[in-house]
Amino acid sequence: MSNKQIFLKFKSGEIILNNFNKYTDSISSKLLFYQNIKNQENNSGNENYKNFNYNYKNKNNYNNNNNNNNSNSSSNNNGSNNNIKFNSLFISSIYLYNNNNSNNNDLKNDKNDNSIGNINKIIKPKIEIQDLLNPFEAIKEIVGNKEDEEINLVKIGIRVLELGLILLPSVLTFPCCFIPGVKELWWQLLLETIQFSGTCWIKFGQWISTRPDLFPDLLIEKFSQLHSQCPSHSFQFTNESIENSFNGKSIKDLFLWFDEEPMASGSVAQVHKALTMDGKVAVVKVLHPNVKSNIKRDFFIIYSLIWAFSHIPEMKWLSLPESILEFGKSMMKQADLELEASHLNRFNSNFKYNSEVIFPKPLYPLVSKEVLVESFEPGSPIMDFIKKNDHHNPTLAKIGLSAYMQMMLVDNFVHADLHPGNVLVRTSDDDNFKSIDNNYFKKYNNDNDQQQQQQYNLPFKRKLYDTIEKSHKKFDSMLGGIQLKSIDFKEHQKSSPKLIFLDVGLVTQLGQQDKDHFIELFTEIVNGNGKEGAELLIRYAREAKCTEEEMYQFKERMGTLFNQVQNSKLSEVHVGQFMSEILGLVREYHVKIESNFATLVMGTIVLEGLGKQLDPSLGLLKAAIPFLLKSQVFSFSNFIKDFFLKSKTSKKQLNNDNNNNNNNNNNNKNNNDNNNKNNNNKNNNEKNK
């Protein structure tokens, strides 16, 4: 077979091989850095890692000059384990093929590049920042309808006047924020003003607290205190929402019992406890009145202000209108409860083999855009365990850390609204009381089977187990008028606690390339390579407006930060504080990073903060290593699968093309034979005549 035929055979596969450079740049460093982790923990072996990496790159350059692949690989992998050696050999063979059959000269250009694991530079093309959308175009972007009835200038004007009156006390007393004895009172006034301004403004303040790459530390600290406990709406509106969502069926048609008093009320929705017709204790989440139209109206005002300020030259680098646009989209997603139900399904699927992590389950068909019915998951707020220094705390810290690392590094599907209010803890006692709760409801339903639904009313608290005396023998309930003669607590053996994650309306997903970048940054943190980490941030930034001198300063200061990691054990590194300082440098030197990237960093900071309160000895970086490796194995295996699938497809396509060509040739031959035969017959006929 000629070289040309070989090239044709793998022509579609060649594209995959070119893309393979992205994986090898990431995978090689991740497969190798695990060895470096062990060496750092033992305070030895750093040089072996660097020497191995240097030989690894020389080996690839050697392959690029068409020398013997196998002998060179075996001679330059001293000190590496068998797995690393195997992957090095595999990657070398791929590169040998790629460089012999394409015009890829990237390896030649990287001979003098000493960055760790950098076989082929991945230079992310600069994303051109689009022209600023005006406020009306921005609304169209988040709702898909420019002619939205709520975007009415008269209504907007009235709302602006209303907000002006609400904000007036804070504006007039603004100088007080500089007076030491009074400034805390002023900040408290501002926070309460934002709370009173409505859903969008509360969420806007919370969003600001998650972007230390854009806003100063003081603002981040103060706005992180905003909470979403808001006034509840009427039970009548809840009933109307349920009827409108489920084909006119009322609460009495869908539930055996429904608590009219909400369990909690947030900025977007409120939740009630109920009992479904099949005897399941459930939570019913109902959107507040006009929440979507209010979000769109207030978003229009916020975006208009930011859009006006963005024309100031000093503000342009922030690209705030783009960030606010992403904020608006996330707000609209949180107001779609069908989407939240799909998120719950995804999380339950991702953690189906992990019994220590629990997400509520949507109870179909009782799911709509305005109403979501999900399983009731009893538990205690995680802050209760932090305050009393419970013996479960170290276990809880490990469970939470593992869950978040799986979301971020393996599943690439991350809960983006993690705060203590959205995390509950369930112990074995909670499981017992949940069983009592369900049995109580079922017994009540069976005993009153002949009664009409409107006749019953259960006068007990929302959490039934709060009213139950913890007895190992019997329990008599006078509140419901029913006596449960014997409820035995058989599960008194100690079991590991479980974490329950709530409110998953907002999630974060990174593209594959951004995910690889995030993992690369983690790798450089572990290795203590500050300058390489700075180069990563600049290389993958959406925009970096640094002069050469500023870029040099940025790299030097990053190097100083990373040296702190290099000189410490991984278990002693405070990742949250470290990443906060990184984002501070990003803001100071005007390096614009992706919003999802910043969200993940903030999630990591919040997670470590909770984890350290539960277990001060928690080491986030050390615990992340298995998940980093697992994510790379998944990426690598998916690539291999995809590569061979595409190669098989291209081979099949080539065979089909060859068969088609053969068929065409045969058809042409048959046509020629028929034409010749017809001509001969015609000549014979003429001759006979």
Curated annotation (Swiss-Prot):
SUPFAM superfamilies: Protein kinase-like (PK-like). This is Probable serine/threonine-protein kinase abkC. InterPro entries: ABC1_dom (IPR004147), ADCK2_dom (IPR044095), ADCK_kinase (IPR052402), Kinase-like_dom_sf (IPR011009). Keywords: ATP-binding, Coiled coil, Kinase, Nucleotide-binding, Serine/threonine-protein kinase, Transferase. ATP binds at residues 263-271, 285. It holds the Pfam family ABC1. GO terms for molecular function: ATP binding; protein serine/threonine kinase activity. It comes from the Eukaryota. It comes from Dictyostelium discoideum. The active site is at residue 417. One of its GO terms (cellular component) is mitochondrion. It is an enzyme of class 2 (transferase). Residues 655-683 have a biased composition (Low complexity). Its EC number is 2.7.11.-. Residues 257-689 form the Protein kinase domain. The keyword Nucleotide-binding applies. Residues 42-79, 652-689 are annotated as: Disordered. Belongs to the protein kinase superfamily. ADCK protein kinase family.
